[in-house]
Amino acid sequence: MRIAARHAAPLFLAAGLTALLAADLPGLRPDGSVLLPNQWSLRPAGNQIPLGDFPVNVAVHPGGRFAAILHCGHGPQEIIVVDAGGFAARTESGHGRHDLTVREPIESRAVSRVPVRESFYGLAFSPDGRRLFCSGAGDEVVHVFDFNQGRLTPQPDIPLRGAAIRGIPCGLAVSRDGRELFAANVWGQSVSRVDITARANLGDLFFTAPGRTAEKIVDTNQPARTEEQAMLAKRAEAALDPAAPDAPFPYACQLDEPRGRLYVSLWAQACVAVVDLKSFQVAARWATQEHPNEMALTRSGRFLFVANANRNTVTVLDTATGRAAETLEASLSPAALPGSTPNSLALSPDDTKLFVANAGNNNIAVFDVATPGHSRSLGFIPVGWYPTSVRVTPDGRRLLVANGRGLTSKANPNGPQPGKSGEAYKQYIAELFPGALSIIDLPAGGGWREKLAPWTAQSFQCAPQPGPAPAAVAADNPVPAAVGRPSPVKYCIYIIKENRTYDQFLGDLPQGNGDPSLCLFPENVTPNHHKLATQFVLLDNFYVDAIVSADGHEWSMGAYASDFVNKTWPLNYGHNASRKYPYPSEGVFPVAAPATGYIWDRAREAGVTYRSYGEFVTAGKNPGDANRTKLPALEGHFDPEYHVFDLSYPDVQRAARFIAELHRFETEGEMPRLQIVRLPNDHTAGTQPGAATPTACMADNDLALGRVVEAVSHSKFWPQTAIFVLEDDAQNGPDHVDAHRSPAFVISPYARRGAVDSTMYSTCSMLRTMELILGLKPMSQFDAAAQPMFRAFQAAPDLRPYDAAPARVNLNERNTTVAWGAAASQKMDFTREDAADETILNEVIWRSVRGATRPMPPPRHAAFVFAQPKPDDDD
């Protein structure tokens, strides 16, 4: 095993680029900051309180001392109540003459927690602070709790509809008198009006025609068990109305009782619906920008602030006219591409300051909004990873920020092992990011500029530092330093695979930073992966930007995962016994798409030809039907005969189809300049009886990759081609550096030969490299800021072709009914990526390869917050 070290830059790079490209590893830095796998870093302001899995909403008690935080992650969902601190009054006796009132500071801490079976974003106190209301999501209820000095006592739920109907209550708003509650039903495409005293839903206002949108995906409380049942579930899922372009996905509610209005942000449409409370009908729709989510209303009701997650902006609506008074740019740079993901807002008690949570930038933007229409930026406050909720205490002294993915890095070599029951499942990557609450003291009086100046500087320092100037990159580097400059590489073939870590594939290579004890598929199983890594350039410091496949394919194709995807995949993966949450990405829902589209949109815009082989393409409605896509930009640009995700279909046959197309292109004299190829079988089907064994699946995937590279390298296009290979995510495989570290390959006549490149790269680095080669504009802040893969290339081409290594194991080996984990695998759904429980699946794969008596070692992870002591339960 080689421990990573910083390497000198090769000679083909200009000397000024050397320091910028030195190897780095995610985790704690000497200066106290934390480097994330995506090349951003953290240095949060204030005090931090550890929380649970993916906190998404903070409700501050009217009294100001306590705050309730709702958690809606993949794991157990809950509400944690935090004593936000501040000051408490204490009277010192003056023996009856001069009693003295002393204000003493209160330590901030978590004081209680209650489990919630299922929830989605909605959380609100009653005006008197005696009750807390919480969305019941798939249970189709509003949870009710009595609140007393930080303690929550569950009360009977308020039913909104029958549990068989799909509404999914989301954002909540409570009337000033505490008698009525409004709930946006995000999948029901409606808003409910609730009589709290009567515990009754008075009616639903639909923003689109009711019908199949309110149905379950499958009318069963059990996951689909057979291939036929799973296929039916997927077909029903794809046919649901919410995937239609006009589905609004109502998200948040904001009451304006003096005007008799309810404002509802429509997540999938760039507008806010204005509901007349008297008639309970939509009176108007006010334009915002893409992905409106949380709102904040001034005390006078004159101005409504709306966060637009897909556009880095906040729309300031004049409620007297329904028009935008101004648009605030919340990103670090006004000209920044999408990626800041503003998803929460808070106004100071005097309505002069606006705080905007930028989930993608890990900071809070601060604006002076004393005069709406003439607002100005005051600066930024650095916080933790992916802030999801920002609130100001009623006295205006403190800012509370829920950080969805935590604060810092920590290895867990002695942590619980996957495959065990109970707490062992905390090691699954979807639950590895316990959040944190940042409590930040705000400046008093006029000290804003002085307080914000160092915070703003830190916020800029936490963003990826600017890449090398064009002059710093050697002129003969095949990767241009800027879009529009020439490259000897004309064609990019982008191969996407499924869910593996670096150590699982390449941990046995002594020249790389690997751990051979964690290598599940060594050279005997993956001879082509090993041969490619040694003949070309070994990348041992590459990280995927995603957590699971739902966001992984979005990151891999769009350099971004939207607010919708990040907030819905945990429910689809971890809370879907009712089958109410469809798989949220890969072109199923228009609301999931990034504002600037995907890489094929950039290619079309630049006049670059492109073609997809199985990516963002689904099988026909019936067996034998041609493939289809819901994305207009892919119509006419995908192979209708290339087999989509189906683990019963060999990757070598997919490779054969691609090679047949390649031969056709050779005959025609030209091929698409950008080709995206999906080879998914390294996902494996576990030990499902009758399915290929994990070893056979991996060997099939390996041979398919080798054959594709062989065919391309022996073709007429090879001298001008670069092949890029990555995994969409790393899904909790063992890795001794980080759970996001993943195998990646650059294969080209211009790729370095027999070299090791330990530069820190990410999914977005690979996208950025292809963009520079093809002359495509970046899609988001993340690929725009990512480190291009300059060091993986060399100036002089080496045209030697690649010859695929034959399989060394039986590709037709099948699981038996007595294989370890066969019973568990039989129950898994393998018709779609990640439909199976990845924690159990990884244990099954490990024991299948290493032996039934060999437990899987725990993975290590960096740049994340790990399990912290839970706050005390109620006695």
Walk through the language-model features, giving the residues of each.
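A generic structural signal for short, non-catalytic loop/turn and secondary-structure boundary residues
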Residues: 15, 42, 430, 549, ...
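N-terminal secretory signal peptides that target proteins for export/translocation
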Residues: 1-5
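N-terminal pro-sequences and low-complexity stem/linker regions of secreted or lumenal proteins
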Residues: 452-875
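Compositionally biased, intrinsically disordered low-complexity regions enriched in proline and serine
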Residues: 8, 119, 129, 134, ...
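Predominantly soluble domains enriched in secretory-pathway, periplasmic, or organellar proteins
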Residues: 20-477
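Intrinsically disordered low-complexity regions specifically enriched for long asparagine
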Residues: 9, 397-399, 629-632
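Bacterial N-terminal signal peptides
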Residues: 8-19
